[in-house]
Amino acid sequence: IFGAPLRTAGVVDVLLAFVERIAKTSRSMSLGVLILHAVFFTITGAYYVSYPVVGGMVKDLYPEYHLDRKNLMRTMLDTGTGLAPMVSWSTTGSYTTTTLGVSNLAFAPFAPMLWLSIVFSVIYAVTGIGTAKAKED
């Protein structure tokens, strides 16, 4: 529902231009996609929108930076998993709020696996540890 209007309004192009502007190395590309997906997921609150839209936007850029595309999915899964319960308008956020009876951010300190996935994703992006390189054809 949100993907097409965001593409039509040019939001997707602006976000992609941001990533292309900051991405000078494979590490900055990974970090840029992490930020891009976090922003896009927070706007839409839906995996089924953010994964195909962000993935479709940047999948062709990864080989240019000698990155295997599996890194793209790992980055999006890390940010999506970590943010989903924190975004109150997402399905996961609504569920956790209703089930636990507390605000989304109130349980964050008690769920380190959520935000640690993002922390480790940033560490992997910055250091290059665990980052698969694209195979030469």
Show the residue positions of the predicted features:
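Alpha-helical membrane-inserting segments
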Residues: 2, 6, 40, 120-124, ...
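Hydrophobic alpha-helical transmembrane segments of multi-pass integral membrane proteins
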Residues: 19-57
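Hydrophobic transmembrane alpha-helices of multi-pass solute/ion transporters
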Residues: 1, 14-18, 22-23
